[in-house]
Curated annotation (Swiss-Prot):
One annotated GO biological process: peptidoglycan biosynthetic process
Major localisation: membrane
Top EC category: hydrolase
Task performed by this protein: Catalyzes the dephosphorylation of undecaprenyl diphosphate (UPP). Confers resistance to bacitracin.
Membrane topology: Multi-pass membrane protein
Catalytic activity: di-trans,octa-cis-undecaprenyl diphosphate + H2O = di-trans,octa-cis-undecaprenyl phosphate + phosphate + H(+)
Extra remark: Bacitracin is thought to be involved in the inhibition of peptidoglycan synthesis by sequestering undecaprenyl diphosphate, thereby reducing the pool of lipid carrier available.
Record-level Gene Ontology MF annotations: undecaprenyl-diphosphatase activity
GO cellular component: plasma membrane
Entry protein name: Undecaprenyl-diphosphatase
Keyword Cell wall biogenesis/degradation: yes
Transmembrane segments: 107-127, 134-154, 207-227, 243-263, 268-288
Alphabetized InterPro entries for the sequence: UppP (IPR003824)
Amino acid sequence: MNEQTYLLASAVEPVAAENMSWTQTLVLSVVQGLTEFLPISSSGHLRIISELFWGADAGASFTAVVQLGTEAAVLVYFAREIWQILTGWFAGVFNKDRRGRDYKMGWMIIVATIPVVVLGVLGKDLIRDALRNMWITATVLVLFSFVFILAEKVGKKDRGYDELNMRDALVMGFAQCLALIPGVSRSGGTISAGLFMGLNREVAAKFSFLLAIPAVLGSGLYSLPDAFDPSTGQAASGLQLTIGTLVAFLVGYASIAWLMKFVANHSFSWFAAYRIPAGLLVMLLLWLGYLNP
């Protein structure tokens, strides 16, 4: 092989992804569990912390797979409600006389999931590459905080769980698409939409978590093969992904329990008070060169 041929082969040969360390895996899994359900953006925090302490992006595939642990926490925490919705939906499908509240709730979740599935599949490359820019993450952390504040001030917050309808579900479903941008927060986008629609905080949070189940489980399973040998980001072993998912589950369950109690008596504006200085700090670190975009 002459020199020109060698250089050409080297240029087109894919570069092997850097392997993640166990420390990085465990830390990021804890961060995932803590931030997935809080409206502060889990993907944004994973991106920031991974870049700040390890100088590399863990990648969207790792994030999607470890999210399976936090969604398992939702399945366990809301097991009774999920079982009621599933049985009610299947019963209604085969028997028109049994089409009650749970049957309708099942359809609301299904229909509201469609927008993020379509956008997620069509925009896969954009999500994994262009949008994972630290400047975008930091800017969105700051700007979207004002959406929380506005939702708290504008929303009446007087509608209960039984008052949820298909319009609410669709609005929250489209809001879930914003979560594809690191820095927005899946729960932040959907809960804010619920508040704008007049839902009370507990109902908005509960439906937000239920709505995330199909999309996150689908994304995690879809990204599972790529997590071992990603085109972007870092590679993790099967054992690392398994332990990371378990850690995210345990921490995520505790996070859900805390948030459901917190929202009963506290405004979501408290999270804006964290997001704004956090985003500004990341901008400063980027400007000083301590973080890579």
